[in-house]
Amino acid sequence: MTTSVDRTDGVLIDGSAGAIQPGSARFDHGQRRAASPGLWLPVYTLAHRELVRFFRQRTRIVGALGQPIIFWVLFGAGLSGSFRGPADMSYQEYFFPGVAVMILMFTAIYSTISIIEDRREGFLQGVLVAPIPRASLVLGKVFGGTILAVLQSLAFLTVGPALSLVGLAPELHSGLTWVNAPAVIGFLALVGFSLTALGYLIAWPMDSTHGFHAIMSVFLLPMWLLSGSFFPPGESVWLSWVIRLNPLTYGVAGLRRIMATNPAAVEALPAWWLCLTVTVLAAACYVGAAVWMTGRRSAHNAR
């Protein structure tokens, strides 16, 4: 019995029996549909795999929360005397939603590094030759990263008031209540979904984590800084336009509107409907581009 390998599709063909596996040119489309587990089972499996991988790395959990908390406490204390936001808002209060979005971004983006690792270990190639829609791979990775990002961002939002009670953030009024908690969680999930899809787009063509970190430094970190998270738009006209054209600006502004304790503090922000619309459109564009990129036949996908 001889066995040959179809290099184009990366599947085995049993030459003696004539059994052709999914992926060959003669494989019937009806058989492919019958062999496919559908869209959502692979999505659930891949998302669950991302969660298991994360919670097995306990140092990653500490680092994901520890660094943003240190940022917030130190910058909040250092700049509190020289900054007053809208409606006399303290810097600790102004920076609070910005740090929550920073946690969303870095957790979502870093979770997509697993794409590079999976390709190196051969797992990704196995998924690509499986009879599942390419959208399942994208959505599985994106949903897994989104869940992790939202959980960590929520953990920070609940830890913040506790830090204010012990004197580390005396000027904080978090704005998170039982009334607006569902809206906060829903909007965090939407922003996290968008950012994870963006991370997928960046990670997919990468061959090494070093290149991914370089993109993080020159593109994603400025994207967060120029979203109104760290400082509000100033007198500079060009800087104000850059901030307005940044899709993440509307994610930060939407979260500020939901958590606002003083309506006067958010009067200058984009309208709520605009924040929601831009965030949804950005997420749809990122996911659509990710599905298209994953579905392309290329030598890179086969590696």
Task: Walk through the language-model features, giving the residues of each.
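Junction motif at the cytosolic side of a transmembrane helix
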Residues: 2-23, 162, 259-266, 273-303
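Short hydrophobic, aromatic-rich alpha-helical segments embedded in or entering the lipid bilayer
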Residues: 2-7, 40-48, 225, 229-273
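Aromatic- and glycine-rich beta-strand/loop motifs that create alpha-glucan
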Residues: 16-67, 303
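Alpha-helical transmembrane segments of multi-pass integral membrane proteins
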Residues: 36, 60-64, 97-102, 106-113, ...
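Hydrophobic alpha-helical transmembrane segments of multi-pass membrane transport proteins
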Residues: 70-75, 91-167, 199, 218
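Transmembrane helix segments
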Residues: 75-82, 203-249
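Transmembrane helix-loop junction
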Residues: 76-81, 126, 130, 161, ...
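Alpha-helical transmembrane segments and their short interhelical loops
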Residues: 134, 138-216, 266-293
